[in-house]
Structure formats: C-alpha cells, structure tokens
Amino acid sequence: MPRYFDVEMDEELIRELKDTLAYMVNPVTIDLFLDDESRCETCPDAYKLMKTIADASPVREGRRMIELRVFYKSNPEHLKEFERQKVERVPTVAMLDGMIRYTGTPAGEEIRGLIETIMRISEGESGLEPETKKVLASLPNLVHIETVVTPSCPYCPYAALLANMFAYEAWKQGNPKVLSDTVEAYENMDIAEKYGVMSVPAIALNGVMSFIGVPYEEDFIVYVKSASEGKLEELVPKTEGEASGL
C-alpha cells in the first residue's frame, strides 16, 4: 500500500501536543487494535502515532492521563476484546468501549479532531447544544455513523469531531445508541467504493449515504434521530459546508 500519510512528528509538534494535553482534566483510555505487520502494513504507523500521543499526555498521581491499551489480533487472549468492541478491521483506534472509533490510522489532518475528541472527553463536555443533548438522550435504536475521510482533507476533522461528540454525549447520558466510526478511505477503499465516495467528508448513517461535507449540528441531529427511528428514507442526502476531492 502506498504511504498516504506521515506519522512522524517533529519536536515543535510534540511540544504543541504536550501544551494542549496539559489541560486534560480526567484520564482517557484509548484502545488500539492491531495485527502483525505481515498482515497489516499500516499497523506499525498506527502504533507509532498513538504511542507518541499517549506519551505526550501529562502524568498525574503516577499515571499517564492517556492510557493506551494495545490488542493484537494474533494474540488469542486479545480476541475477546476484539469481539466485545465488535472490531473487525485493523488498525482501529477506539474509545468509550468502541462507541468512538477510527477505522484506519487517524493521521494527517485527522490528528486535530482526535486530540479535540480526547480533550472534550477528558473535560466531560461535548460542546453540543442543549436541544441536541436532549434528543441524544432518548434515541430508541443504534445509529452507526461512518464518516469517510482522508489524511489530507482539512474539513474532515470537523465532521469526525461532530459525530464523535454525538456518540460521547449519548454514552455520557447512559443511552449509548450512537457509534461514531471515522473511516480512513485509503486504508478502507472497499467502504469508500461501497458508498461511491468522490468527495470527503462523506457521512453514512446506518449504511445510507446522508451528507457530503461538514453538516450543521441542527441538521445532523435531525438525520441521526430519523436513522434511529428507521425513517431515514424520508429525508434526502444533503451537501453542506466544505468538502475535498478524494
């Protein structure tokens, strides 16, 4: 597979990362699902990236504020965690017992959205509007959000962050009915091709392409609610905000 991203960080970037993560309030656990390099060409890069991020987090009371747990598909003892979090592809980065996940390496522009997701979970605040929070607390059925992205897309982190915060807010309110899955297109071309993705971010809800571009929160919650209620076919796909060519 050609390299579509670079996971190396220079000293300045690592310093900026440390400065941001220094404001973490509560610890955050990140699960990294990998396989041997012979079966997963990008897994070493995913490990290198996530280890760099975890090591940049502050130490409080003798422990890192980002706890990185690593599970290998080749290790029989780790397979239960793959099954529990319903992880089928590697590499996968997961939080909140798999309700927020990155299928593929969250490199390039996606690092920004990942760090902001970590910070908001650490701070305990999704940043969503009160009405959005109210709807998320009462969703009846699971909504699987797939946000298809590329490492070079400058708009994709905003779409991924919004989806992540929908998942976090629902989880936080004890109604984990939103699974936010940020899919790196180049590592998962079959998913991008399934949805006919030509521009990113592209967002599918329960297997139905619903948005091209970064959705507005007030529109996104309408679609997520409809998907949860099985009424998504009543809405037409929308193009909002900015998008980049695949």
Segments from the language model and where they lie:
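Short hydrophobic/charged patches on amphipathic alpha-helices used for structural packing
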Residues: 18, 79, 133, 189-192
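Non-catalytic, surface beta->alpha helical segment in thiol-disulfide oxidoreductase systems
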Residues: 94-125, 199, 204-246
